[in-house]
A protein has these predicted regions:
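Gly/Pro-rich, tryptophan- and cysteine-flecked surface segments typical
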Residues: 1-276
Length: 276
């Protein structure tokens, strides 16, 4: 996970598990301020928890395995009383995932990589509605290497979260949402990106993307992006190639209004090698 430049008074956690196919989550809450603070925790299933007297610089762990939850997948909102906090979530099972909590949402988050039915990999996108009203969200999928453009629509209640992508490409489930609709093809290999293109109540949203390959216990997690934060220059702190069998790749989404010329990216990549 990435470090923090600052905390926030409210933190949103879109993806939490309790015994979800063997996965449980836990998260650390750190006081980044200069005064003692209390933290109230509200889960999307209606349960609550709290932290009292969290001192400056101190952190405390909250484990979902020790809490009472009916659903296996849910979300949380943390509210600090007196100082900003930072939160990191760990998803623990046969594969280890991690992501950082969100301080704010945006109406149309972007997910640069969706990887479905690709050599055993599948992707689950958890989107949390951090607003005060229910909203119907449409996610549009755009292929880059493989697949067909399609859409998926679901209702997300205020404070709650819903799983996108997984149940329209990889795994069928019983749908009870009257607003649910999709043009995606179950079982299709899809490699591309996704974006929230409709949000009926214009609620702020946050999202976490999980990619998993069960057979070899491989996976990764990242947080969705606000298009307004897009830049013309991107810095990658770690790039690997043939490093004890590891290599890296990246997915880049054009969040602007104009198309990019073919080859524009490959002609403007600079690699810096470490000394020694």
């Amino acid at each position: 996970y990435g470090g923090f430049s600052s905390g926030s008074m409210t933190v949103y956690l879109p993806t939490l598990f309790k015994d979800n196919y063997g996965y449980n989550t836990f998260y650390y809450v750190q006081n980044t301020g200069s005064a003692d603070t209390n933290v109230s925790i509200s889960y999307s299933d209606g349960t609550t928890n709290s932290i009292t007297g969290l001192k400056p610089g101190q952190s405390k762990v909250i484990k979902q395995a020790n809490e009472t939850h009916s659903p296996k997948v849910f979300s949380a909102t943390l509210q600090s009383s007196a100082a900003e906090i930072a939160v990191t979530v760990v998803e623990e099972g046969n594969t280890l995932f991690s992501y950082v909590g969100f301080g704010a949402g945006s109406p149309n988050p972007i997910m640069p990589l969706i990887n479905q039915n690709n050599y055993g990999y599948f992707t689950g996108v958890q989107i949390q509605n951090t607003g005060a009203s229910s909203t119907v969200v449409t996610v549009s999928y755009q292929p880059s290497i493989s697949g067909t453009a399609c859409t998926e629509k679901r209702t997300i209640p205020a404070g709650g979260s819903k799983t996108f992508s997984q149940f329209v490409f990889y795994q069928s489930t019983t749908e009870t949402d009257p607003a649910f609709a999709t043009t995606c093809t179950m079982g299709q290999t899809f490699i591309g990106s996704a974006k929230v293109t409709a949000n009926t109540a214009s609620m702020p949203l946050v999202s976490v993307v999980n990619q998993l390959q069960i057979a070899d216990n491989k996976g990764g997690t990242y947080g969705a992006f606000n298009a307004a934060d897009g830049k013309q220059k991107i810095i990658y702190p770690l790039i690997m190639d043939r490093n004890f069998g590891y290599f890296t790749s990246w997915s880049i989404v054009n969040v602007g209004a104009s198309p990019m010329a073919a080859g524009a990216l490959s002609n403007n990549v600079t690699v810096t090698e470490s000394a020694g």
